[in-house]
């Protein structure tokens, strides 16, 4: 895959991970993404939470077949916040998202009281299962499709057991639950508020 930057600071890749990039935009900005489907099956990009036309929003009826391409073009009409994008093809959304085809879509705004830069941290939480060769395992049986399943490893930003050194400062955490079924209850390890 290739990411072609439209302007400085628009795309933040997550280093050493299988996840998609973090896209940073501003309200009113025009977005243009050329999606060339090189997957074994059809796919489509759903821009989760964005106010855009149905044709651009990645509905399964607009799935892009293998080898085909489509250009998503829209103007950001959302208020500043944290959104995400992921595939949404009929009946195979789960396996494609599980494989890492997802990323954050951040609409930036002027909030002088909120931390920015290194103090504005994305946290994409996922649970996954791996086989003996450290390859992702997606239980694709009927019960897993109906009820979902819980992985045995927690990943943060696509990496296991990661830690990030921090300064004694106020941080803004942009948390995305990218798991297929798991619900998280987050708390500080020392029990503080």
Language model: regions and residue ranges:
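Histidine-centered copper-binding motifs that mark active-site loops
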Residues: 1-193
């Amino acid at each position: 895959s290739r990411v072609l930057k439209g302007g400085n600071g628009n795309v933040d890749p997550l280093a050493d991970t299988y996840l998609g990039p973090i896209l940073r935009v501003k309200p009113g900005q025009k977005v243009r993404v050329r999606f060339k489907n090189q997957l074994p099956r059809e796919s489509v990009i759903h821009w989760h939470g964005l106010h855009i036309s149905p044709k651009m929003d990645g509905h399964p009826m607009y799935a892009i077949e293998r080898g085909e391409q489509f250009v998503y073009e829209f103007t950001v009409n959302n208020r500043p916040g944290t959104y995400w994008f992921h595939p949404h093809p009929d009946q195979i959304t789960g396996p494609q998202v599980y494989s890492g085809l997802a990323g954050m879509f951040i609409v930036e705004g002027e909030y002088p009281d909120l931390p920015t830069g290194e103090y504005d941290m994305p946290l994409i939480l996922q649970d996954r299962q791996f086989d003996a060769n450290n390859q992702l395992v997606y239980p694709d049986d009927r019960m897993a499709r109906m009820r979902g399943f819980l992985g045995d490893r927690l990943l943060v930003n696509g990496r296991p057991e990661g830690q990030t050194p921090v300064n004694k400062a106020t941080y803004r955490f942009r948390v995305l639950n990218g798991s297929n079924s798991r619900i998280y209850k987050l708390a500080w390890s020392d029990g503080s508020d």
